[in-house]
Amino acid sequence: NVLAVGNGPVFLLAAKTAAAAGYPTTIVSARTELFNQLLWAEDEDRDANLRILGVTEDEDVTAFNEAVASADALIVAFDAEQTLTDTLLDVVLPAEGGASRVACLSKHLSGKGMGPFVTASKVAANKEVWCAPPERVEMYRSFEAKLKAKVAAKGGDVTIVRGGTLKGGGPGDPESVQTVAPTLAPRFYAEIVADLVNWQLLFDCETRGVELTPGDSAAGPGLQAVFTATASDARPGDSGRVQVAQALVRSLALDGAAGKEFGVTTKAARDHPSDGEWEAEFAKVL
């Protein structure tokens, strides 16, 4: 059983991907109706493996407590630049019982390829650009250390999946929809700020490949940042949400991923990677 916590499109995608991989998966939402519209296209069958709990009913709270206790694995995936609070971390990872395997989405923290141009592009072009400000880098580092210590204390393992600027997450245009990897519904594009929609949709059609990088070695866009911020092709510093979700979920089944960290970067491709291509990428970094 998998429990997924976080926020935003990458969180929903990770949960949908886990369910599609055959894991009974639980998430909690205060906005169940919107979540369902983002998760499932109108003509798409809902996956019985994915359970969305509300937060209002007593039975939801009971079901959530049961989901925490029965979880084998925990996925932590925040779209926004934030981490779990200490209180919530204690709730989803109790000292006794609960998940012993954790896949956590973090960021590239090395500072390579960052700097004033990247920071400027976040302000001017795309507020979702990852520009590695020192206080956020410290926040992620401190959370990773806390998470690893907590999981190690109960004999478990953490895999850290590092991303940069998160892009895409939907099915692409209607002509190019694929079923190899789960995506969010077309409604995803309606939720994006108007001037960001077109290149996100193009990204979901053109940049379906993935390249994994060992440890914390991936670089940001550097001087190119102003051009990469809203680019739909494969550029340094970017990570596709669909590929990040795949990496999080696939790492759970890989013994070699326990205790490891790696980065997810982009690669031009009209097709989502096959199982064989994923195996080859993991072999490079684990």
Residue spans of the language-model regions?
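Oxidoreductase cofactor-interface core, primarily capturing Rossmann-like NAD(P)-dependent enzymes
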Residues: 1-50, 59-71, 79-82, 86, ...
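Short beta->alpha junction loops
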Residues: 55-57
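Hydrophobic beta-strand segment of the Class I
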Residues: 74
